Amino acid sequence: FFIDEDQRVTWSDIGRKAEIELRARLAGATVTHMQLQSQFRCNGSDGYLAWLDDVLGIRPTANSVLDPDDFDFQIFDSPVAVRRKIEALNAKDNRARMVAGYCWDWKSKRTVGAMDVVLPEHGFSMQWNLARDEGLWITALESVKQIGCIHTCQGLEVDYIGVIVGPDLVVRDGQVITQPERRSRQDRSLR
């Protein structure tokens, strides 16, 4: 099993290390612990992972600043600016996409042409990734015109990702706070 106990997509996610060890013992299996030393997804940088842990408040680390020479990390004031940047980066080799937490209803699933992620204060609207693309949406040529949700991008890889932070994630008094009640009621992972 490959486990990151700091990540969870649904309330019902199972597989904590202690639970797997218990089940293995009950089945008479031997457990061998190994640690992933680096990840290709983040240039093999443990510093990037430590920075994420620090900035998201998972655990304090010595990496409170991201090295700008290793990563292109930008914060935009507008989702329109994010979309423009992602479209420009994608024009090179089809390896840039946008994602968001499941905070907006998936209206286009039933109503062709309906927009899903709508932020009227920014003049921004896009559709969720299309149902017809299923698990391959991120590689489809036209998917740069869609937004993937956390359920459809988990484990997939691109060179550039634009993240729309929805109302389920806020910063209060310097702390990152999750508000799961602000996610779409269509999100079955909340049940």
Where are these regions (language model features)?
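Core RecA-like ATPase module of SF1/SF2 helicases and allied nucleic-acid translocases
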Residues: 26-191
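Signature of the SF2 helicase/ATPase Hel1-core->accessory helical subdomain module
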Residues: 1-36
